[in-house]
Amino acid sequence: MEFDFDWVDAFTDQVFGGNGCAVVHGGAVLPDAICTAYVRETSLVECTFTGPSEIADFKVKYYLASREIPFAGHPTIATVAALRHRGLIGEGPLRLETGAGIVEIEVRGAQIAMTQIAPVFGVEVPVDLVADVGGLEPGDIIGQPQVVSTGLPFCI
């Protein structure tokens, strides 16, 4: 099997700037082991694999070097930019099927606007633990740290 791919720098107009992402067109059919191996080979943080969808315009699968993840922001922008560059989409609304649900996109010229997936709020994290990890004093932290995810969970 052969697949076309694009190496996209999202959030920049500079070559070798921004957030890199490889977009493998038609690759959503590949097994997880191949997708994760591909990410490792590229040395990128995330890569996307597109395919047809019965419920949206395209299906997008997101992978780290170790596993599939439900969604990620900059790879979504990179994927849409690659689809646009190849002439696979035009201007206007676009719906992507992701592991986290349907993502609404609006394409206007070179601008890509994405409606972020609603956050999922996880466990609260002790202030002293976050302070220790960040080399801070507990009093330096304003508010209660909590794990929040719109695709990948982070403590904020």
Walk through the language-model features, giving the residues of each.
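Active-site proximal loop and beta-alpha junction motif in alpha/beta enzyme cores
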Residues: 1-71, 77-156
